[in-house]
Regions:
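C-terminal transmembrane helix end/exit motif
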Residues: 6, 179-230, 259-275
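Alpha-helical transmembrane segments of polytopic membrane transporters and translocases
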Residues: 23-46, 78-82
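Helix-loop junctions and terminal segments of transmembrane helices
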Residues: 43-63
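Short alpha-helical transmembrane segments in multi-pass integral membrane proteins
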Residues: 72-102, 170-196, 211
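Interfacial segments at transmembrane-helix termini and the short loops linking adjacent helices
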Residues: 74, 92-123, 236-241
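Membrane-proximal transmembrane or re-entrant/amphipathic helices at the cytosolic face
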Residues: 225-294
Length: 294
């Protein structure tokens, strides 16, 4: 969708609305080279961690063990949501600090971080859709992910043209259709999994509970960032002090986020020992949890 959306965006703003080519290209560059690049990082991590579970799906389905295949798919989706949901919340609440950390150009910081905070939600849907695509392919339904993508592409293209033609959303229209595209692929894939594999997910356990824990995590991370930034205020007087202060505050906020999310997930029973063991380095995570007496 990237090249198609870029073409539509550039042509409609320049040819139809008379926007300057330099300004339009700059705005698109901030979106694609900053906000999208950052949002893709947790998607890659979530996919890498969860894809370790996928080979078992093919093996179970080859043995005609549909119950085992359903269990494997459900576990993969659950682990992905456990990783993707806090990643999305973290990007949303720490969008400005993270953008400053990776792309410290002050002239584009506000726009890039605001786009990232909106785009963060796609982390959840793209991460899970990557797993469901692989699951559908594992059960021999190779064409279904293409159908999902095709349906989503048509709808998001129509919506993008309408938004650019009839609103002044400008580059934010690209964010909105990116969200729409990710949600549609997620929804259509979920339908296919229910139809062809009989999967019924526990929405409360797989999505709502991690979301509540992630919300608490986000509040803690935001508070820690603010407090550490205030404490490190004297660093502003140093050369590039604002940047180093941001590094310190962001690192503290991320550490707080990991601790709060891990603690609330374990204490609430949202994540279980067997969930941790199904992840790469799961034994290490279990030992760490035991040492912390969680």
């Amino acid at each position: 969708t990237t090249s198609l959306n870029q073409t539509i965006y550039m042509r409609m703003l320049i040819d139809l609305k008379g926007a300057g080519e330099t300004a339009t290209t700059t705005l698109y560059g901030i979106f694609s080279n900053k906000a999208v690049v950052i949002s893709n990082i947790p998607i890659s991590i979530a996919t890498a961690v969860s894809s370790a579970i996928i080979p078992g799906i093919s093996a179970a389905y080859a043995r005609r063990d549909e119950t085992g295949a359903r269990r494997q798919v459900g576990n993969a989706i659950r682990i992905t949501s456990i990783i993707a949901i806090p990643s999305a919340v973290g990007l949303a609440v720490l969008a400005r600090p993270i953008t400053m950390l990776m792309f410290p150009q002050m002239e584009s910081l506000e726009l890039a971080s605001s786009l990232l905070s909106l785009l963060a939600v796609t982390v959840i849907f793209y991460s899970i859709s990557t797993i469901t695509n692989a699951a559908l392919q594992s059960i021999g339904r190779m064409n279904l992910p293409l159908i999902s993508a095709g349906i989503a592409l048509v709808v998001q293209t129509v919506v993008l043209v309408a938004l650019l033609r009839f609103t002044d959303l400008d580059v934010r229209a690209l964010v909105l259709v990116s969200i729409l595209y990710s949600v549609m692929i997620f929804a259509v894939n979920q339908y296919y999994l229910r139809r062809f594999l009989g999967i019924r997910q526990d929405v409360r356990r797989d999505y709502l509970q991690p979301l509540v824990c992630a919300a608490l995590m986000g509040a803690a991370a935001k508070a820690v960032y603010y407090l550490v930034s205030m404490a490190a205020e004297p660093m502003r007087n140093l050369p590039k002090g604002f940047y180093f202060r941001n590094i310190v505050a962001t690192a503290a906020a991320l550490l707080a986020a990991v601790l709060v999310y891990g603690y609330t997930m374990v204490r609430s029973g949202t994540i279980r020992r067997k969930d941790l063991l199904s992840m790469p380095k799961g034994q290490l995570l279990v030992r760490l949890m035991e040492k912390l007496h969680w």
